[in-house]
Amino acid sequence: MPVLDDADKQLLDVVERAYRRSEPDHKTFRDKADEFYRLYRGFSDWRQEQTPYRDQDDAVSEAQEEWGAELFIPFCFSTVETIIPRMVSNGPRMIVVPRDEQALGNVRNMKLVIDAQQKQINYDLILQSIGKDGLIYGLGVGKTRWKFEQRIQVKAQAAPGLPNIFQESVPTTVTAFDDAVAERVDPYDFMWDPLSDAVENAEYVIHRMWLGPAAVKRLVDQGIYRSQENDPSCPWTLEDLLAGRARTQRSNVWDQRLSAEGYNTESTRQDALHEAWEFHDGQRVITVLDASYPVQAGPNPSGLATIPFQIYRPTIVGGRFVGISEIEPIRHLQYEINTLRSQRRDAATLALMRTFAYNETAVDPQDLVFGPNMGIPVSGDPRDFLFPIPVPELPNSSYREEQAIIDDIQRTSGISDPVQGVDTGASETATGVQLVQAAAGLRIQNKARLLETQIIVTQGYEFVALNQRRILTSRSYSVPTKPDPNQQYIPAWEIVHIGPAELMGRMAVEVEGGSTAPENVPQNRQDAMQFFQLSQDPRLDGEKLLVRGLTLMGVDQPEGYVKALNPQVPATQVEGFLNAVGIAPHRFAQWLDEQQATSAPPAPLSSGGPPPVNGNGPPAEQPPPPAPQGVPM
């Protein structure tokens, strides 16, 4: 092994001491998380004993000695999978707020950039993964960083001198990705300061990564990891790095989860992987490979002076870094209902397949065959040598106990049949169902709000800081624009060029509350009808109300579907113009009435008689109409 200089030894010592401080608490967390993951996956000890056998007949023969059903009722799974889609079903709607004068004109540009970045990484799916980790383990971890990636690309291009003929281009290196990203970090590979209860007051965190030999070589070739190939003063070479091995076997961390998923983990193997410890303290980052080589050291990669990690805890416990998962409070109830249902299944098996006591001197065991059209020849009374052992019936109290366990699970988790969408029939009134759904909705809203404040808002600040730090040239973004009703292309788009100057200023990030929740389509349709009715009120802006109603109906860019209104000329301007040209206003109003009368279809007479008269004379003269209130242009 190469001899490290004093500076490298100091870096290695900092990370090594931090790792040793964090490992005991993290090992305790992993042991608890293994149990929670087995409950989430519906894993039983019987399956664990059965999995290693290549031929499962051996396992079956051993199980026959101690028979019994091994049922697993997936309450933990249904609880987690009921909450997570109600928390995150859509991408968040970010709100960028200016905090100084320089940011006043730039917050719109920053929002366009952040929305484009989050869309290209499927941000809502990342939030689901982080949220699910929090619901299962009590801790979900996110990370923000700037990702730069180059790849080899081949594209079609016009042949030289032949513009109508295309051919493949020469493979060229292109920038495939150059933007801020948010990632999910496996809680099993995230270690923290044991004296902290949040990232904000942690002295450090360590992100453990597993790398293959090809990944290590690529990082050295790109100059990210140090070696003599890119730094002549470095004491180690790429060959030294590839010859190292991880101190912690990845299989030791993953075996319990792989076993819960049904994979064979009993075979002896050596993981040909490298273990990287990425140390962050908010001021610098140090990466140590295989607990031996400090391959990277530099300033904090975040745009902020903070640790670029975020944690989500669905239920926060004061003074503790890890919160309470959704599985932890109901795990003993899960074990209890598994046992109860398995015992009931065993009782049914005993009732269907009776146990007999027989006289072994009178009956050959091979003659004891049960089935349709079966008979055993005997000499004498069969009751003298064959007697069915009585099996007591299962008490009805077991069903009441099962319902009590289910009620306890639902009361603890807040997830009941009405919340899951199960038809309750006539057992529940409509008001009762609404009250249950409202109570569960408040609990889920609280967990979603914690996800917004702990993950989305914090990562939004990181996105702003990273963009202000790493975007150094002008970039083009396509954004929807207000379409022209006279054009057929809806939706309409425009290209916006945004550079570093258009992103400057002190900004804050907020998220529209509940924007990640699933849309209530029936409620939106009902609200849309209300907006359509309000648009008929002359006191309100009908166009804005129509646009809002179409938006609730799910129409993209509804402005393009609203016909432009004819502008109205104020009555005072019309009257002033008529007086200027010497025309009485009531004469102009009479002329408008005549124009409307000639264009309108004739109305039928009510009784066929002449028009009404004033006494016996001609039709009465009508007083001049009032001055017009407005004339369409």
What are these regions (language model features)?
Residues 1-59, 134, 142-179, 183, ...:
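C-terminal anchoring/interaction modules
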Residues 96-119, 222-225, 229-234, 243-244:
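Charged, compositionally biased non-catalytic regions
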Residues 116-124, 149:
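A conserved hydrophobic secondary-structure block that centers on an alpha-helix together
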Residues 142, 273, 310-317, 544-549:
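Small/polar, repeat-rich beta-turn/loop motifs that tile beta-strand-dominated architectures
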Residues 287, 296-310:
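Hydrophobic/aromatic interaction determinants used to assemble and anchor large protein complexes
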